[in-house]
Structures are given as C-alpha cells and as structure tokens.
Curated annotation (Swiss-Prot):
Gene behind this protein: hfq
Organism taxonomic ancestry: Bacteria, Pseudomonadati, Pseudomonadota, Gammaproteobacteria, Pasteurellales
A Pfam family assignment: Hfq
Membership in a protein family: Belongs to the Hfq family.
Source organism: Actinobacillus pleuropneumoniae serotype 5b (strain L20)
Family matches, as Gene3D superfamilies: 2.30.30.100
A GO BP annotation: regulation of translation, ncRNA-mediated
Protein name, entry field: RNA-binding protein Hfq
HAMAP family reported for this sequence: Hfq
Biased composition (Polar residues): 69-81
CDD domains in the record: Hfq
Domain of life: Bacteria
Keywords: RNA-binding, Stress response
Region spans: Disordered: 69-92
Length: 92
C-alpha cells in the first residue's frame, strides 16, 4: 500500500463497512450525498438513488453524517462530523 493512502483507505473502509451516510464536496463546489459502496486508488462509488463513480482527484472533502471510528496501523482514530457545515451548496 502506498504511504499516502495509509489513512485514506481505513477511513473510507470504515465509512463503507458501517454504511455511514456521507456528503462529498467536489473541487467545483458541488455537494454529493450517499453511502460509499466501494473505492479503489482512483475512484469512490457513491450510492444514493443511483450509483455514481466519483474520481478522487475531483474531491475536496468527505464529511460523514456521524462520527466514525477507524483503525490505522493499530492506532484507533475517531472522526466526528462537524456541528455546522461550513460549505454552502452551490446553486445550479
């Protein structure tokens, strides 16, 4: 596994395994919502009413709807969802 993905993979896997709803903000400001169905080195499959393949290079932020516990090389981390979202939805 690449050194840069040692945090990313366990975090995304915990979100997938626990079926935690997420908001994914893209670099262009678009907000996508759903559950992570699968992921690899380059893409995330996000499922809502349909499945979407989202390229990781287009993602700015992944925000879980609730706190998530994940294990990174024997060290346990807890990430909590923010109380207030700082990014506004982009009107189309």
């Amino acid at each position: 596994m690449a050194k840069g993905q040692s945090l990313q993979d366990p975090y995304l896997n915990a979100l997938r395994r626990e079926r935690i709803p997420v908001s994914i903000y893209l670099v262009n400001g678009i907000k996508l919502q759903g559950q992570i169905e699968s992921f690899d080195q380059f893409v995330i499959l996000l499922k809502n009413t349909v499945s979407q393949m989202v390229y990781k290079h287009a993602i700015s932020t992944v925000v879980p709807a609730r706190s998530v516990s994940h294990n990174n090389g024997g060290t346990s981390h807890t990430q909590q969802a923010p109380a207030v979202e700082a990014v506004a939805d982009k009107a189309e």
